[in-house]
Regions:
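Conserved "HGTGT" condensation-loop signature of ketosynthase/thiolase-family condensing enzymes
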Residues: 1-90, 104-112, 116-248, 252-254, ...
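Nucleotide donor/acceptor-binding cores
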Residues: 112-113, 377-379
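Short, solvent-exposed loop/turn segments at the edges of secondary structure
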Residues: 248-250, 361, 390
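A conserved active-site cap/scaffold subdomain adjacent to cofactor or substrate pockets
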Residues: 354-362, 374-377
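Oxidoreductase and adenylate-handling cofactor-binding alpha/beta cores
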Residues: 367-374
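Short, surface-exposed amphipathic charged segments that create phosphate/polyanion-binding patches used
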Residues: 101-102, 292, 358-365
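Active-site capping/gating segments
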Residues: 387
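Conserved phosphate-binding catalytic cores of ATP/NTP-utilizing and phosphoryl-transfer enzymes
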Residues: 96-105
């Protein structure tokens, strides 16, 4: 590839808004995103008006806090641009990395000249307005095409088997995966929690220095582990402090082009951040159809391929920014890459401390890593995750162009393999089953509310189910906190044998 077609990031813009959560400061996502775009253009070359008019592709991650019939078209209208290519991505945290990687591939191939990737959320403002009885559309004039929070499709919740088992929320599924992963590497529940707390403490230190962070305060692991009214247990073993915090108003934008076009628009050479390329992969969308719940072949695949194509060893990368909606994601990456979790804290600050603007988060990571490279870092690896640890994408950025030009592989590889045959609840055997993954969800008063279980029968079939709400006896069989979550964790549940009985579409769990 000719060096002049090397894809580069030329402008980054980030917006933090309404952290005080007032009605007066509430703005819809479109306005926040447009502000981020103008900031990116100014970052590239002053006002950037001509640059924005010349944009020929606009792609956006999914926006959940407000629905738009055609967000790229609305942005194009505001920018006086006439893009030949537009795309609004479905739900998925991997999309910012995938969109930037695809944009870089098109630029390198000469298929486009200037691409814009932008997104954002206004979930904090939407909550403020709802509590105040203010209608964003009729009272504040937010866009009404169609308007309102974006609907969640049934497919976004999980497979029918997952839905029947109550595995329809990330707050339930990710801790279940972590219990399986921890057991597979010989960790006790206390060690799983301590590892997660260390990850999120390191992330909070980064957030404390990030002016776009929603919660910019450094926290130590002991504080993160301490369960109480301000840090209640959500789903074992995750207290609130290690859960993503989506109620934020944040937006980000990246402008990409070739080196030649960048110089044509007057962007200084030292401001260019080269997109070396990336890799995408996907595991089975149905968590219960995966061969094992203790890992992610897709995560390993994208890290392997992105680094191998770039000719980099993990320990040689200057900035490694791994997705951090829940501790299990950086824990898995740390184990696979052979790096300490602190080395994966990156440049953003994590979904709890920086804020978790849903599908847009990694756009902030890419912007923050681009700034790190401009400040002297040589390379950055940005990882993104979507679904229930399902879809993965990683991108490598560099201060200099890669010797081979763009080396990415933006089309995701399918890593799905057939898992164990399911065991319908109606056929649950009377003999004990072995726990593969489990969690207990707590109510807002700090009491165990419901248990969730994945287990294997003696012949290897997998069963999944949830207990009835208020079934304290079953919750006791699945909890790692026999004395309550304010006390130290006890023995692991994963690997233990229990008896399961179907009761009205739910399960009752008894000792083996």
């Amino acid at each position: 590839m000719h060096a002049e077609r090397s894809p580069v990031v030329i402008g980054v813009g980030q917006v933090l808004a309404n952290r005080d959560r007032t009605v007066a400061a509430a703005r819809e996502p479109l306005r926040l995103i447009a502000d981020a775009v103008h900031a990116a253009a100014a970052d590239a070359c002053g006002t950037g008006t001509r640059l924005l008019r010349d944009v020929d592709a606009i792609t956006v991650p999914h926006v959940a806090s407000w629905a738009y019939a055609d967000l790229p078209a609305l942005l194009a209208e505001r920018l006086a641009a006439s893009p030949a290519r537009t795309f609004s991505a479905p739900v998925g945290g991997q999309w910012p990395a995938a969109l930037v990687d695809a944009a870089a591939a098109r630029i390198a191939a000469g298929e486009s000249r200037i691409e814009l990737v932008a997104g954002g959320e206004a979930s904090a403002s939407l909550g403020v307005l709802q509590r105040a009885g203010v209608d964003p559309g009729t009272d504040l004039g937010w866009t009404a095409e169609p308007g309102g929070p974006a609907p969640i499709g049934a497919d976004d919740l999980g497979s029918p088997a997952m839905q029947a088992a109550g595995m329809v929320l990330p707050t339930r599924v990710y801790p279940m995966v972590d219990t399986a992963f921890g057991h597979s590497v010989g960790e006790t529940p206390a060690e799983i929690m301590a590892s997660g707390a260390a990850v999120f403490a390191a992330l909070s230190e980064v957030a404390a220095t990030n002016p776009i962070a929603w919660n910019p305060a450094a926290r130590d692991p002991a504080e993160i582990l301490r369960v109480g009214p301000d840090n209640r247990m959500i789903c074992e073993p995750y207290p609130l402090a290690v859960n993503a915090f989506p109620l934020v108003d944040q937006a980000a934008a990246l402008l990409l082009t070739s080196r030649a076009v960048a110089l044509e628009h007057g962007v200084p050479e030292e401001r260019l951040v080269h997109v070396w390329g990336g890799a995408g992969a996907a595991d089975a969308a149905d968590v219960l159809a995966r061969p094992a719940l203790s890992g992610s072949p897709a995560l390993c695949s994208v890290l392997d391929r992105a680094l191998a194509s770039a000719g980099l060893a993990a320990e040689a990368v200057d900035v490694v920014d791994v997705y951090s909606c829940f501790p299990v994601v950086p824990r898995l990456a740390s184990r696979y890459l052979g790096l300490p979790t602190k080395a994966l804290a990156g440049a953003t600050g994590g979904h709890s401390s920086f804020g978790g603007p849903l599908s847009t988060y990694t756009l902030h990571s890419l912007a923050a890593c681009a700034e790190r490279i401009r400040s002297g870092a040589g390379t950055a690896l940005v990882h993104a995750n979507g679904g229930y640890l399902t879809r993965q994408h990683a991108v490598v950025l560099g201060r200099e162009a890669h010797v081979d030009g763009y080396i990415g592989d933006p089309e995701p590889h399918d890593t799905a393999e057939p898992g164990p045959a399911p065991c319908p609840l109606a056929e649950v055997p009377e003999e004990p089953v072995r726990v593969e993954a489990a969690t207990v969800e707590y109510d807002r008063d700090g009491h165990p509310a419901q248990g969730f279980l994945v287990a294997r029968t003696a012949d290897g079939r997998r069963l999944a189910g949830c207990t009835a709400e208020g079934d304290a006896a079953s919750a006791r069989e699945l909890t790692v906190f026999p004395e309550g979550p304010a006390h130290p964790a006890g023995e692991a549940v994963v690997g233990r044998e229990v008896r399961v009985r179907p009761v009205g579409g739910r399960i009752q769990v008894d000792p083996a």
